[in-house]
Amino acid sequence: MAKAKFERNKPHCNIGTIGHVDHGKTSLTAAITKILAETGGATFTAYDQIDKAPEEKARGITISTAHVEYETSNRHYAHVDCPGHADYVKNMITGAAQMDGAILVVSAADGPMPQTREHILLARQVGVPALVVFMNKCDMVDDPELLDLVELEVRELLSSYDFPGDDIPIVRGSALCALEDKQPEIGRDAILKLMAEVDAYIPQPERPKDKPFLMPIEDVFSISGRGTVVTGRVERGVVKVGEEVEIVGIKNTVKTTCTGVEMFRKLLDQGEAGDNIGALLRGTKREDVERGQVLAAPGSITPHTDFEAEAYILNKEEGGRHTPFFTNYRPQFYFRTTDVTGVVALPEGTEMVMPGDNVKMIVTLIAPIAMDQGLRFAIREGGRTVGAGVVAKIIK
């Protein structure tokens, strides 16, 4: 039988493996590529190739991440796997590898461990929409009651972090058996069952173009006789000529109308996600708009000053701070295109934050910024990046 051609006409989804060290995340990643390669949906990538993941820089932070791609009959997947725990923390917080869903790997022999908990919490804080669980190393457990116990424990843990623990699919298997062609019911078959659950349970992400319009403003020009033009790259959605838009953030929200869209000096009927455009705004004065504000579909986003964040603080080797910081630390928070000063309050029980730590914190900005949950930011001191974070919850 000829192999099916690798086509890009299927819906695309970004996923990753998360879970405690040595529970088998990388083995599972290798096993998925091996089993799907049988039907031409992947190229087998061995454990060693995934494990020596190259280092990448995202927002000035060094992260090691392995990327593999594969497809099922329903979808095309880009899958990320990180060698070390710190890489996961950085990856999830910076959004370097955006995850539409994740496979939580738990060893049946050990049950949930500290990093299992931490990765679930991070997934919740950074807004990973859905998880599927792979209970790995089932070949090492003889007692089926023990497997039931571990499953119960995992479900309770998921529920305690506001994931639907009762509904999340948990697939039992062994990545090693799949890689070594042993015990197909927990090897090959379990991998196929896992991928069927991922296909069915992880929702298809909305394409950026289908979301409400938003464009971070990078520059503002005044064109005599025409009005004010704002430029930027459309982050999501579509803006059509003649539509009403809002200017949000820093100052009071103002409504205006987009009377023209220009790209590469050509006039267009609309600008959409990914386009670098200039938008002509009716009746808006040059001094009423500034970099750092956003142009958005009316009512789709609101400005806020107070939020709870999950942040990673760079260590000395990454070019970060050399000393810890405490409550009332006042750095700049860089959102999209601009820096805003903010004050940090640390949670009770956290006295200080050391370089290299990840931390939950409450931030109060001196000016409101257009934000929603999941927005990424950099923490800077005089233009130098000292951390990265994500808005976990808006307070006001």
Swiss-Prot record:
Region (G2): 60-64
Record: residues binding Mg(2+): 26
Residue span, tr-type G domain: 10-206
Region (G3): 81-84
InterPro entries given in the database record: EF-Tu_GTP-bd, EF-Tu_GTPase, EFTu-like_2, EFTU_2, G_TR_CS, P-loop_NTPase, Small_GTP-bd, T_Tr_GTP-bd_dom
Enzyme class: hydrolase
Location of region: G5: 174-176
Keywords tagged on the record: Cytoplasm, Elongation factor, GTP-binding, Hydrolase, Magnesium, Metal-binding, Nucleotide-binding, Protein biosynthesis
Keyword Protein biosynthesis found: yes
Binding residues for GTP: 19-26, 81-85, 136-139
Example of a GO cellular component annotation carried by this entry: cytosol
PANTHER family assigned to the protein according to its UniProt record, in alphabetical order: ELONGATION FACTOR TU, MITOCHONDRIAL (PTHR43721:SF22), ELONGATION FACTOR TU-RELATED (PTHR43721)
Role played: GTP hydrolase that promotes the GTP-dependent binding of aminoacyl-tRNA to the A-site of ribosomes during protein biosynthesis.
Record-given protein name: Elongation factor Tu
Species this protein is from: Paramagnetospirillum magneticum (strain ATCC 700264 / AMB-1) (Magnetospirillum magneticum)
